[in-house]
Every structure is written in structure tokens, then in C-alpha cells.
């Protein structure tokens, strides 16, 4: 990933939640994710979003930045959960009991909801970046290393949202 800010989210859904089609965000179309995002934000008991800048990712590495963003997301919940269901990891320095679930976004509706919230939040930011840096095609490639994106990097150089430690492989 060349791009930008890293997002993670935490979502507490009501016990009787009946939101349909919650699944791994990568398996849903962009329009379905947008639709579900609105439902999640309306029906969730609480949503917390954490983010880390490309500079912070470069400074401490992607894994530690991911943990920081996860801790921030949990800290922003308005309700302290009794248990965290996590997608495959145990978050260090969190005192709430945790259950890591492999492929959790396909097995847990709350993990799927958190995955959708984080992805839609990030995609919306990439669409805003596209207005500032249109030559990179962020609205369409979302910052992933498509051929067009790599060509733009080679032609125009890096932007402040590119991760320095990653793009050096390409330019």
C-alpha cells in the first residue's frame, strides 16, 4: 500500500441487531459498503474510529501503527465493551478481554461492521485527496499500487500522503 492514513474502527451493535449483508468489506461492492455504513452509523450503540498518518506508520512500522489506531478506536467508544472481538489479533495494552477470530470480518457482524466503517472512512478520504492530487487517481485506485498509480508516482513523485518506506520500492 502506497497511500495514506491508516484507519481502524470499533463498533458496538445492539444485541438484537438485524443488519443484513454485513460481511468482509473487501467482498462487498463500494455502493453496498456505503449503504451499510449509513445503516451501521444509524443503528450502532457506539462507533470509534482510530487513524494513523503515513509519517507515523513510517516512524513505528505498520503493525505498531495498526495497534495504535485500534487502541484509539476502542478508546473513542462511548460505551466500554465487556469483550472485544478482533479480526485475528490481540491488541497490546488493552485491558478489556479480547477474542481474536481468524477471518473475523466474515464470521462476526460487529467485526464486519467495523471493517466496513474503516474502509468507507478511508475511501472517502481518498476521494478528497483525489481533488487535491487528481493526477494520482486516488478516487479510483484508493491508493493501492495500480499500474496507473505507479506511473503517476514515477512521473510526478510522491505526495505528503504516500508512505516513504513503501514507495521507495517503486520510484
Named regions from a protein language model:
Residues 1-171:
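RNase H-like, Mg2+-dependent phosphodiesterase core
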Amino acid at each position: 500500500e502506497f497511500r495514506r492514513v491508516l484507519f481502524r474502527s470499533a463498533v458496538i451493535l445492539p444485541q438484537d441487531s438485524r443488519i443484513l449483508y454485513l460481511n468482509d468489506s473487501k467482498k462487498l461492492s463500494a455502493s453496498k459498503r456505503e449503504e451499510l455504513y449509513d445503516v451501521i452509523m444509524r443503528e450502532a450503540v457506539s462507533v470509534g474510529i482510530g487513524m494513523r498518518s503515513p509519517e507515523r506508520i513510517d516512524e513505528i512500522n505498520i503493525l505498531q501503527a495498526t495497534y495504535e489506531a485500534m487502541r484509539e478506536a476502542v478508546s473513542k467508544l462511548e460505551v466500554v465493551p465487556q469483550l472485544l472481538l478482533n479480526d485475528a489479533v490481540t491488541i497490546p495494552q488493552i485491558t478489556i478481554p479480547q477474542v481474536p477470530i481468524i477471518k473475523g470480518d466474515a464470521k462476526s457482524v460487529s467485526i464486519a461492521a467495523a471493517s466496513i466503517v474503516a474502509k468507507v472512512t478511508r475511501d472517502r478520504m481518498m476521494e478528497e485527496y483525489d481533488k487535491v492530487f487528481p493526477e494520482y487517481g486516488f478516487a479510483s485506485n484508493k491508493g493501492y499500487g495500480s499500474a496507473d498509480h505507479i506511473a503517476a508516482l514515477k512521473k510526478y513523485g510522491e505526495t505528503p500522503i504516500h508512505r516513504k518506506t513503501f514507495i521507495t520500492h517503486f520510484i
